[in-house]
Amino acid sequence: MKDEVRLLMFTQETECAHCKEARELVQEISELSNKIKGETYDFVKDNEKARGYKIDKVPAIAMIGKKDYGIRYYGVPLGYEFKAFIDNILNISNEATNLKEGTKRQLESITKPVHIQVFVTLTCPYCSTAAGLAYRFALESDLVRADVIDVSEFPHLGQKYSIMGVPKTVINEQIEIVGAVPEAQFIAHVLQAQKPPSIYM
């Protein structure tokens, strides 16, 4: 690991079923290396900080490197999501995405903000692929932010986005991707989100 990575854990112990588990996991991960720092904040008491990091639900983990890359995990990153979470910490620390050069160039062409939400479950073997791509896109481009959300912990979002299977990716509240897709297809959908809604609706 090259640079320090901060894991900002937002919790609300009294009303959040899995906040304690998420907080303990962040503590354990922060003990793996002196380059990983775990910080815990109360979603209500520290609401200004939560708003500053665009945290709107808990448990939430913001992963911060040299700067805030807009990468968030909502839930407890266990199961198949654990490896993708750890890989992302390493990528942030080393500022490495391992994306194809063509993908990097396409990300450089983005001119409008892109919000990627990847809905996952911990028992889904393909979800970590979609999550990993979203993480890396956000790390590569300042205009991309990525939320990975364990839909089993936020069932109201499952209803809102009509999630029947995972992974399901929602880009800018308009474009939906069902399943894990290759890097080239993923970036194509991201670029599509740059067009006016009338073009892709």
Question: How would you describe each model-predicted region?
Answer:
Residues 21-77, 96, 110:
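N-terminal non-catalytic structural scaffold regions of very large proteins
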Residues 34-46, 141-158:
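Thiol-based oxidoreductase modules, predominantly thioredoxin-like and allied folds used
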Residues 62-96, 165, 170-201:
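Non-catalytic, surface beta->alpha helical segment in thiol-disulfide oxidoreductase systems
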Residues 102:
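Phosphate-interacting basic helix/loop segments used at nucleotide- and nucleic-acid interfaces
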